[in-house]
From Swiss-Prot:
Coiled coil: none annotated. The lineage of its organism: Viruses, Monodnaviria, Loebvirae, Hofneiviricota, Faserviricetes. Belongs to the inovirus G2P protein family. GO terms for biological process: DNA replication; rolling circle single-stranded viral DNA replication. This is Replication-associated protein G2P. It catalyses: ATP + (deoxyribonucleotide)n-3'-hydroxyl + 5'-phospho-(deoxyribonucleotide)m = (deoxyribonucleotide)n+m + AMP + diphosphate. It comes from Enterobacteria phage f1 (Bacteriophage f1). The gene is II. It comes from the Viruses.
Length: 410
C-alpha cells in the first residue's frame, strides 16, 4: 500500500522572482505577498518595535501546519525557495489514514491517493491552492509498505530482533534509529530508507495516545480515528504483522523509471498496472531487493512461549495510579524463564542470589508451571529459514472484508 505520499506544488510563474546568489540564480516568492493573497499566517525570526509605533519584521517563514480531514491530518508547508528548493507548497500525509482512518492495510492506487491529498487541500485552503501550478505538481517521496505474517506477536518480535544484525551491500542497519519493535536501514540516505516494525505494537500505541486525551480536547477526526482503530477485527488482523516499509525518495524513483511529475506518474502507473503488474509493489520489491538477498540461506532459532507469557501476565500485573495495566513484573519473570530455557536450571541457580532465585521460581510456579518442568527446560532445536517469516504474500495484504476506500472531503 501507499503509506505516505509527499507532493510539491510549485507557485504559478507570475509569483516567482529570481535573484543571483554567487553564480546561482535562485527562484523565490515574496512570502508576505503570498500571505496577503492566501490569508496564511507566517512566523518571523525578528520583530523590531520602534518608538514611533512602527514594527519591522524580518526572517519570514511558514511552519508546518496540519489540515484536518475526515479521519486524519494533512501536513503542509510553504517554501520560499532556495538554491536546492523551488518555491512551492509541500503537502504530505498517509493516504491510507486520510481515506480510511488507519494504515494497517490500504490501496496502491496512486491516482486515488493523490486525489485524497489534493482535493482535501484545495477544499481547506482554496485561496492558497489558486496560487499554485497544480499541473506541475511533483512527487517528492512515496512510502510503499507491505507485510509478512508471523504466527503470533511473540515470534514477530523475535524476527525483528534477528533483523537488527542483517545488512547487505549499501543497505546498512541504522542502530541509532532502532527501537524495541523497529529496525531501520539507511536512515540518512537520499535514495531510500528501509524500515521493519511490528504493526500491532504501533497500533496499540496509537490507540493509547488517542484514548488518553480528554474527549472535550479531541478533534472530530481524532474521535473518528479512535473509533476505526478500536475495531476488534482490525486489531486481530494486525497481530503478528511484520511491516516492511520503503521510504523512496526522488532519486530512487527516477532510477526505477517513474516520472516525477504527478500526472505523468499516474499515467505511467495506469499503463504499468494494465500489464497485470502493480507499480507500488514492484517499487517496494526494487527497494528491498538488496536487503532480501541477505535473507537467503539465513536462519534463526525460533521459540514460541506465548502460552507461558500469557500465564505469567494473567497472574503478575499491577494497575497504575492512572488506571493502566503494567506488566513490568511479568516481563522480569518471563525473562527469568527464558534464562532457564537457554542456560539450564542449575546454571541459573549458581549465578543468582539464592533468595532471588527461589522468589522467581515461586512466582512461576504460582502461574501453573510445575517446578519439575522448570528443572528440565531446554532450548528446542527449532532452527528455521529466515525467509519463512519474511514471506510477503501480495495476495493476502488485506482481509477478506476490505473494500477500496471512497474519498471523503472534510
Amino acid at each position: 500500500m501507499i503509506d505516505m505520499l509527499v507532493l510539491r506544488l510549485p507557485f504559478i510563474d507570475s509569483l516567482v522572482c529570481s535573484r543571483l546568489s554567487g553564480n546561482d540564480l535562485i527562484a523565490f516568492v515574496d512570502l508576505s505577498k503570498i500571505a496577503t493573497l492566501s490569508g496564511m499566517n507566517l512566523s518571523a525570526r525578528t520583530v523590531e518595535y520602534h518608538i514611533d509605533g512602527d514594527l519591522t519584521v524580518s526572517g519570514l517563514s511558514h511552519p508546518f501546519e496540519s489540515l484536518p480531514t475526515h479521519y486524519s491530518g494533512i501536513a503542509f508547508k510553504i517554501y520560499e525557495g532556495s538554491k536546492n528548493f523551488y518555491p512551492c507548497v509541500e503537502i504530505k500525509a498517509s493516504p491510507a489514514k486520510v481515506l480510511q482512518g488507519h494504515n494497517v492495510f490500504g490501496t496502491t492506487d496512486l491516482a486515488l491517493c493523490s486525489e485524497a491529498l489534493l482535493l482535501n487541500f484545495a477544499n481547506s485552503l482554496p485561496c492558497l491552492y489558486d496560487l499554485l501550478d497544480v499541473n506541475a505538481t511533483t512527487i517528492s517521496r512515496i512510502d510503499a509498505t507491505f507485510s509478512a505474517r508471523a504466527p503470533n506477536e511473540n515470534i514477530a518480535k523475535q524476527v525483528i530482533d534477528h533483523l537488527r544484525n542483517v545488512s547487505n551491500g549499501q543497505t546498512k542497519s541504522t542502530r541509532s534509529q532502532n527501537w524495541e519493535s523497529t529496525v531501520t536501514w539507511n536512515e540518512t540516505s537520499r535514495h531510500r530508507t528501509l524500515v521493519a516494525y511490528l504493526k500491532h505494537v504501533e497500533l496499540q500505541h496509537q490507540i493509547q495516545q488517542l484514548s488518553s486525551k480528554p474527549s472535550a480536547k479531541m478533534t472530530s477526526y481524532q474521535k473518528e480515528q479512535l473509533k476505526v482503530l478500536s475495531n476488534p477485527d482490525l486489531l486481530e488482523f494486525a497481530s503478528g504483522l511484520v511491516r516492511f516499509e520503503a521510504r523512496i525518495e526522488t532519486r530512487y524513483l527516477k532510477s526505477f523509471g517513474l516520472p516525477l511529475n504527478l500526472f505523468d506518474a499516474i499515467r505511467f502507473a495506469s499503463d504499468y498496472n494494465s500489464q497485470g503488474k502493480d507499480l507500488i509493489f514492484d517499487l517496494w520489491s526494487f527497494s528491498f531487493s538488496e536487503l532480501f538477498k541477505a535473507f537467503e540461506g539465513d536462519s534463526m532459532n525460533i521459540y514460541d512461549d506465548s502460552a507461558v507469557l500469557d500465564a505469567i501476565q494473567s497472574k503478575h500485573f499491577t494497575i497504575t495510579p492512572s488506571g493502566k495495566t503494567s506488566f513490568a513484573k511479568a516481563s522480569r519473570y518471563f525473562g527469568f524463564y527464558r534464562r532457564l530455557v537457554n542456560e539450564g536450571y542449575d546454571s541459573v541457580a549458581l549465578t543468582m542470589p539464592r533468595n532471588s532465585f527461589w522468589r522467581y521460581v515461586s512466582a512461576l510456579v504460582e502461574c501453573g508451571i510445575p517446578k519439575s518442568q522448570l528443572m528440565n527446560l531446554s532450548t528446542c532445536n527449532n532452527v528455521v529459514p529466515l525467509v519463512r517469516f519474511i514471506n510477503v504474500d501480495f495476495s493476502s495484504q488485506r482481509p477478506d472484508w476490505y473494500n477500496e476506500p471512497v474519498l471523503k472531503i472534510a
